[in-house]
């Protein structure tokens, strides 16, 4: 498996209403995309920065021997 399991979870804003800009990994495009997080609930596919998302979910598949 190339990515951590939580990278495949859908973006989940949770049940609260804080409307915080966050990033999630989109496996279909192999890119990190912005979404708005409510501040509670949700899942682990939720990163404060695009770089953190990229390092965790995109870069984890790069540079591995085939």
UniProtKB/Swiss-Prot annotation:
Residues carrying the site annotation Reactive bond for trypsin: 17-18
Residues annotated as domain BPTI/Kunitz inhibitor: 7-57
PROSITE patterns on file: BPTI_KUNITZ_1, BPTI_KUNITZ_2
GO terms for MF: serine-type endopeptidase inhibitor activity; toxin activity
Record has Amino-acid biosynthesis as a keyword: no
Tissue expression from the record: Expressed by the venom gland.
Any one annotated GO CC term: extracellular space
The organism's place on the tree of life at top rank: Eukaryota
Cystine pairs: 7-57, 16-40, 32-53
Record key words, sorted: Disulfide bond, Protease inhibitor, Pyrrolidone carboxylic acid, Secreted, Serine protease inhibitor, Toxin
Keyword Cell cycle recorded: no
Family per record: Belongs to the venom Kunitz-type family.
Name listed for the protein in its UniProt record: Kunitz-type serine protease inhibitor Vur-KIn
Organism this protein belongs to: Vipera renardi
Native organism taxonomy: Eukaryota, Metazoa, Chordata, Craniata, Vertebrata
């Amino acid at each position: 498996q190339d990515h951590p399991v939580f990278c495949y979870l859908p973006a989940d804003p949770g049940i609260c209403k804080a409307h915080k800009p966050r990033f999630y990994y989109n496996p279909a495009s192999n890119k990190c995309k912005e979404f708005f997080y409510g501040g509670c609930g949700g899942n682990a596919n939720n990163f404060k920065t695009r770089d953190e998302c990229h390092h965790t979910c995109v870069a984890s598949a790069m540079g591995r021997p085939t």
